[in-house]
A protein has these predicted regions:
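Nucleotide-activated chemistry modules centered on ATP-dependent adenylation/adenylyltransferase
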Residues: 2-262
Length: 262
């Protein structure tokens, strides 16, 4: 399959169980072997209220580019944690203007790092990074997802051992008890596939990639990767943490688990 093209042949829609997603009647094997464009088309046609979440890195940009032909007005959820690199915020604004994205910015309940420090003390991201991520990423995303029936993510199986079993589609249960679908159209793609698509389609890249960063999160918890390191080895260096939590909460169907859940 030529990954550099926008879309392959459309996927014949499996029998969806859309209302409530209590027990998704989905042909997981067929979806797992479909190309990303077909998966996105299926999701756009089958899921009434759908959104995509991205931090404007390469995988997310590939999905946004594909969606220009499928659902250009799809809500794009962006978690503004208050700790992003200035380059991330500037690039997100640039791509939002360039592609006329329907951007929905999400923020934690405290609104700013300064207010968070007043409540929890300074540098919570060092003392309790799980709590910092829960406040600024997991909780605001969970609140936003109450408005949707499904969401799309750009995570891939080759990014880390914890993501190696990522399904193309899985169900998540929100704290309220609402069950939604989570779609990973690029689960089967490699980093090289993403790079090839980006180059072939002239998609701009996050400026920090040129400075040795491979996976870009909040500035206090992200460094450039060293020679021989994996893509996500620059995240939460020395903190015993590899995921922020937005890809592991409330799973109902799908094999991906965090170490704590295994």
């Amino acid at each position: 399959m030529d990954v550099t093209t926008r879309r392959e042949a459309p996927l014949p829609p499996p029998a969806p169980h859309v209302p409530g997603f209590a027990s998704p009647a989905l042909d997981y094997e067929r979806l797992d072997h479909a190309d990303p464009g077909a998966i996105l088309s299926w999701a756009a046609d089958s899921i009434p209220q759908l959104a995509l979440a991205t931090s404007f890195q390469s995988s997310g940009l590939v999905l946004l580019h594909l969606l220009q032909d499928i659902r250009p007005d799809l809500p794009v959820l962006f978690l503004d944690t208050g700790f992003h690199f200035p380059e991330t915020l500037a690039f997100a604004s640039e791509m939002t203007r360039k592609w006329n994205l329907n951007l929905v910015t999400l923020r934690g309940e405290h609104g700013s790092p300064e207010r968070q420090a007043e409540i929890y003390g300074p540098a919570l991201y060092k003392r309790d990074p799980d709590k910092c991520c829960a406040i600024n990423k997991v909780a605001p995303l969970q609140r936003a997802l109450e408005n949707y029936d499904g969401w799309i993510s750009g995570i891939r199986r080759d990014q880390s051992p914890l993501r190696a079993a990522t399904p193309t589609v899985e169900a998540q249960m929100l704290p309220s008890g609402k069950e939604i679908l989570k779609i990973h159209p690029l689960a089967n793609w490699s980093k090289a596939d993403v790079a090839a698509y980006v180059e072939a389609n002239g998609i701009p890249s996050h400026p920090l990639l040129e400075q040795g960063f491979a996976s870009i999160g909040c500035s206090p918890c992200t460094r450039a990767v060293r020679s021989g390191e994996a893509e996500r080895d620059g995240r939460w260096d020395g903190l015993g943490k590899t995921e922020c939590g937005i890809h592991s909460f409330g799973k109902v169907h799908g094999p991906m688990e965090t170490e704590a859940e295994q």
